[in-house]
Amino acid sequence: MAEGWRLFWVGVELGGGWADFAVRGRRLGFREGQPILVSPDGRVDARLSEFFGRSRFASRATGTRESYVLDYRLFFSFLWWSGRGWDQARVEDLEDWEDWRLRGRGNPRRIGGAKWIRELAALRLLYEWAAARGYVVSSPVWLRVVRTSVGAAVRVPELAPVDVRSSNVKWLTPRAFRLWRDVGLRG
């Protein structure tokens, strides 16, 4: 497969033909640590740069931003290899991507439901932002309404898996609880 989207970070000095990349990025108003995605044909999309620097994405924790931008790079590369730009993503593309990521027979790096939920959250953040600004016709992340255990209605991605544990909770057996209570609390 041809090379996909490339990721750079403002403030990171690069060698080769990219030696002045960080300096040029700062001069253009990019923030320190801001990601820059470069398409396979060498272009930087100003709309993505706006998203990375001036949206809810920019206020996310550093680890979240780093994870999300890697998800964007993979999904955009998938779209590119399918003949589409990031702003042309369709629901069908996301369905194909979900199938490849979770169940793809030739995929050596399949992922689980928890990582897929994170990827959906990343894509939902981007595409809802882009749709609100008219950069895309609509988000490829379709939503449905579900009821929580207390009866509140929430919108969740249609492709969200239903069998995902949100945390790895370890429960104490009654015997272990009594031991913890007697030794840990009572001394």
Protein language model regions, located:
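N-terminal core-binding DNA-recognition domain of tyrosine recombinases/integrases
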Residues: S49-G63, R73-V162, G187
